[in-house]
Amino acid sequence: MTSLSSSAAAARATFVMPSSVRGGMSRGRRMARLVTRAAASSPKLPSGRRLRVAVVGGGPAGGAAAEALAKGGVETVLIERKLDNCKPCGGAIPLCMVSEFDLPLDLVDRKVRKMKMISPSNVAVDIGGTLAPHEYIGMVRREVLDAYLRSRAEGAGAEVVNGLFLRYEAPKEPNGSYVVHYNHYDSSNGKAGGEKRTFEVDAIVGADGANSRVAKDMGAGDYEYAIAFQERVKIPDDKMKYYEERAEMYVGDDVSPDFYGWVFPKCDHVAVGTGTVTHKPDIKKFQAATRLRAKDRIEGGKIIRVEAHPIPEHPRPKRVAGRVTLVGDAAGYVTKCSGEGIYFAAKSGRMCAEAIVAGSANGTRMVEESDLRRYLAEFDRLYWPTYKVLDVLQKVFYRSNAAREAFVEMCADDYVQRMTFDSYLYKRVVPGNPLDDIKLAVNTIGSLVRATALRREMEKVTL
């Protein structure tokens, strides 16, 4: 990638994208574009050039954003620090993501149709009986999914750069350029630490995860985060058969005081992990407890990889500043209670990119902060209720072992399972049957009353 002059005036006049970008963009412009309309106040870009956007981070959010930008006629550079990154992620994706993002089925390692919820006292409830034959939860490996989405973005015309984003300089005048500083990694030049380079863009999409440097630069504010710890375990074939279409979730103070432990199937191994917000120093103790709870089914297995990573607990206080915005984990789009983030990352990346394409009239006009705020407003309208409901569920049912027992008891109800899977698989809230809703409310209250009584009895025994 060509290093550009640090002189703002000169660089604005002589900005040159890498030849691979120019060639790629001509391919991208031949692809189908969104028909968009920019605001009348948006200034036209100088003749002969298009809107330039840097996407920082090459996970689901960054890959989806870069592809949509390139298809929409925007000159796009995606910067990813580690192209073979394996993230400690359960890897679950909803069924709607497969069709919505046109994912090939061979990307899905396992189709989970059975879920076992296991309470603190090891009471197990099987979930999945309400699923239709074609319905499943997809299990993917992040290193495979992320690489696929990046390659698709590259095919659409985006330039994928192996490098570490360092910081950005904000423009000194209206409609001026942002200067992106990064370390460019190239094994051929013999510089293991990378070569410092800069380039200019009109907008920046921060998709660089929970520890986002873009968020830090824009003053996005801090948030609570969980630490996720996961081991990939290669287990004997006869034990792997048990997990062919099954995943397990363990709840209890032993595996996590505020989250859950899991055993999720991958292509030829299982992922065993847990997470916590409140007791991060004890994460390895919780992981050992998760392994112990699953001992009978993973015994004889060999740990082939150990992973740890922060997971945001709620959206950041600020997600847009000028022509810089955040998507995915960088924005804090991970749901409480379930810890789901892949779909919301990809969805936010695409929605953000579509807002930029629309606001810039397919890359022919300067984008404005108001365009980016439209993406935020639409994302919040669609998904904010989901975040709030799961936040409440976590506070109610994860507060004690007695409450977790009540939670697992509720999961045995077919109506609960049907409503839960509908909302998860299709990311929609389907109106329920009023009579069933009343029954569910009564059962929930009953479960919580029993949980409270159980907690008091447990406290007496402890005393």
UniProtKB/Swiss-Prot annotation:
Keywords: Chlorophyll biosynthesis, Chloroplast, NADP, Oxidoreductase, Photosynthesis, Plastid, Transit peptide. This is Geranylgeranyl diphosphate reductase, chloroplastic. GO terms for biological process: chlorophyll biosynthetic process; photosynthesis; vitamin E biosynthetic process. GO terms for molecular function: FAD binding; geranylgeranyl diphosphate reductase activity; geranylgeranyl reductase activity. It comes from Oryza sativa subsp. japonica (Rice). It comes from the Eukaryota. Pathway: Porphyrin-containing compound metabolism; chlorophyll biosynthesis; Cofactor biosynthesis; tocopherol biosynthesis. One of its GO terms (cellular component) is chloroplast. Catalyzes the reduction of geranylgeranyl diphosphate to phytyl diphosphate, providing phytol for both tocopherol and chlorophyll synthesis. Belongs to the geranylgeranyl reductase family. ChlP subfamily. It holds the Pfam family FAD_binding_3. It catalyses: phytyl diphosphate + 3 NADP(+) = geranylgeranyl diphosphate + 3 NADPH + 3 H(+). PANTHER family: GERANYLGERANYL DIPHOSPHATE REDUCTASE, GERANYLGERANYL DIPHOSPHATE REDUCTASE, CHLOROPLASTIC. It is found in: Plastid, Chloroplast. InterPro entries: BchP_ChlP_pln/prok (IPR010253), FAD-bd (IPR002938), FAD/NAD-bd_sf (IPR036188), Geranylgeranyl_Rdtase_fam (IPR011777), Geranylgeranyl_Rdtase_pln/cyn (IPR011774), Geranylgeranyl_reductase (IPR050407). It is an enzyme of class 1 (oxidoreductase). Residues 1-37 form a transit peptide.
